[in-house]
Amino acid sequence: MTISPQYIWNQVLDRLKLRLNPTAYETWIASATVQTFQDNCLVIQVENPFILNHLQKTYYSLILEEVETIVGYPIAVKLTTSQEQNLRIVDKNKDNLSSTKLQNKRQQESPKLNQLNPRYNFSRFVVGPTNRMAHAASLAVAESPGREFNPLFLCGGVGLGKTHLMQAIAYYRLELYPNANVFYVSTEQFTNDLITSIRQDSMENFREHYRTADILLVDDIQFIEGKEYTQEEFFHTFNTLHEAGKQVVIASDRPPKRIPSLQDRLVSRFSMGLIADIQVPDLETRMAILQKKAEYENIRLPRDVIEYIATNYTSNIRELEGALIRAVTYISISGLSMTVENIAPVLNPPMEQITASPEIIIQIVAENFNVSVEDLKGSSRRREISLARQIGMYLMRQHTDLSLPRIGEEFGGKDHTTVLYSCDKISKLQKKDWDLSQQLSELSDRINIASRNQN
């Protein structure tokens, strides 16, 4: 007798309901539905990526245990989202799609689009008084690159939306023109590419790559300070693109004139277009950001909770959204209802980043990735160890004042170029990988807590 997928899942739900507190069950499990049971694999669909991420981290082993108990033998369980399911349905019926839909599908599969964070688009950017000009200028550049505001210089503190707007410009153009040469890079990536081309005697390839861009977007240009040869090469790249009517967009945490050791001619070039300043969002904008974030992640938030978080987290958007995730996670784990009284203990006061010891950082990263401290300090190239080591280097750069060579020493005598590569890689990955970004935020919180307790 063949057991139906629905029967299996109904039995699993009944067992999970007994093992979990009611709030956790209703929040994370109840809405999940069974899709198929083929080739010893049960496919379970959930509503959104946020729930998917939490289930995989927190409840996957429990679900697998109960499924195997019902079935009676080892099988695989795959968790998926409704968005992924819809994409598969579209693919199966592609012969019936209009030419417009086929074109959109091809655009979504563009390799350049895949390098961007799909959450960083114009529709998800909340406009307020402190970022209105930057948003309007970015949209104008996306619609008609090279005509107005060239270059566009986005200026603002950490976590205020500069990267969001830059990637939104790239996303907008690539959706319309998948084959356009739209390059979004960090200043460190530009520098690393330059160093590699010098070592490999391939400067012509480097120049051809960057100087044939239709739109060049360079993030964190403040890190060009003190790099004379990088400034020289970027100056000529800028001139070539600008003279050809191509668009250049630059982002920095400070205006051009305040970037130390920046060549005067670059200050002049960066200032010849529009410098759009982004300030800390006001209370109403912060509340709107939280509301939109909750809607996209399918989270129900009482208005007083939104107002409480928005009132207490004022520095930047990244901190604001991190507080929301902490509150939702705490409520789901504790089984409490979502009220100001229940979330206040974990959110108030806001977690401030403090200087941590290298030992604390390495220990927390090792525990998180289930590897040993010796693994992190060793030379193993196993994927899970290598990634954990790179994340450890990135976090050490964020939470300490150590130089790159000193960080390398803490990880078993690694070269400073290895540390730079690792930090740049994780910095770029977190901008397009929401799960990694949240993981880094959680690790930072643990590092801060451990450091505060040590002090």
Swiss-Prot record:
- Which residues are noted in the entry as ATP-binding? 159, 161-163
Q: Which GO terms describe its cellular component?
A: cytoplasm; plasma membrane
| Record organism | Crocosphaera subtropica (strain ATCC 51142 / BH68) (Cyanothece sp. (strain ATCC 51142))
Q: Which GO terms describe its molecular function?
A: ATP binding; ATP hydrolysis activity; DNA replication origin binding; lipid binding
Q: Know the name of this protein?
A: Chromosomal replication initiator protein DnaA
Q: What InterPro entries is this protein classified in?
A: AAA+_ATPase, Chromosome_initiator_DnaA, Chromosome_initiator_DnaA-like, Chromosome_initiator_DnaA_CS, DnaA_C, DnaA_dom, DnaA_N_dom, DnaA_N_sf
* Region called Domain I, interacts with DnaA modulators, residue ranges: 1-73
Q: Name one GO biological process term.
A: regulation of DNA replication
Region called Domain III, AAA+ region, residue ranges: 115-331
